[in-house]
Amino acid sequence: MFSVASFFAGVGGIDLGFEETGEFKTVYANEFDSYASETFEMNYPTVKVDQRDIHLVPVEDVPKTDVIIGGFPCQAFSIAGYRQGFEDKKGRGELFFELMRMVEANKPRVALFENVKNLVGHDNGNTFRVICEQLDLLGYHYTYQVLNAMNYGNMAQNRERIYIVAFKDEEDLNKFHWPLSIPLTTT
């Protein structure tokens, strides 16, 4: 069983996908929003959510895990927002670097990041370049793809998101395959 630390955990949607495989168990979650945290704890009764702002979480407080997952806030990169990126006046753009702080300290075998599909093209590709450079600096090998929720899990929702999967070991990356789509049978 692979252990998971979940950041920007929300209500646990990404965790659910991992746990439903039967191979992963979320052992730590960090979520600042109290309502989302409460729902997460109802969905995962064995996990007490760390509700501190990620800036205030010492890396020593996060257990060493095999996997780190994080759907870092997307408002700074979304075409629906002001697209201020890392310069977002509310500080949401730089939260990716807090996630990288956790990856650097924890050194998980695998990290998965989720965000809006516009992340790749934001600021003429500079934002995504910075993200890739951070992963390179930490010695991770990665792949990414834009997936639409309605093609995975029989969900009648047109929701395109980018997923970045990073592996500490390049052999693990070479063994990785993106999931096959599932025909939509519900509308």
Model features per residue range: what roles?
Residues 33-34:
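Conserved SAM/SAH-binding beta-strand->alpha-helix loop
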Residues 40:
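Conserved SAM-binding loop
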Residues 46-53:
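Conserved SAM-binding strand-loop segment of SAM-dependent methyltransferases
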Residues 57-65, 75-187:
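Class I S-adenosyl-L-methionine
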